[in-house]
Amino acid sequence: MSKLSKIVKNEKRKVIVARYAARRQELKRIIAAPGTAPERRDEAQAALQKLPRDASPVRVRSRDVVDGRPRGILSRFGVSRIRFREMAHRGELPGITKSSW
């Protein structure tokens, strides 16, 4: 089990990312557009830098939804590799069977 403070911090980051997503997308579109005037691009870059650091989606960490483990996450299921194996053995994941050949 991860520290609760780390899990809570990650949840706060998700909220901040969602709050600023539209603004970040608009600024990045202005910066990337080839027809944007240089001074307009500079203004957009400055505005993007003034947004909170946690507004960037790369700062959100994928965590196991059961215990918050930060590594070895299978994003399709939202759990870590260890939890996935346990749940698969107990038959809690529909359609998942252990391979044998």
From Swiss-Prot:
Keywords: Ribonucleoprotein, Ribosomal protein, RNA-binding, rRNA-binding. It holds the Pfam family Ribosomal_S14. One of its GO terms (biological process) is translation. GO terms for molecular function: rRNA binding; structural constituent of ribosome. SUPFAM superfamilies: Glucocorticoid receptor-like (DNA-binding domain). Part of the 30S ribosomal subunit. Contacts proteins S3 and S10. Binds 16S rRNA, required for the assembly of 30S particles and may also be responsible for determining the conformation of the 16S rRNA at the A site. HAMAP family: Ribosomal_uS14_1. This is Small ribosomal subunit protein uS14. The gene is rpsN.
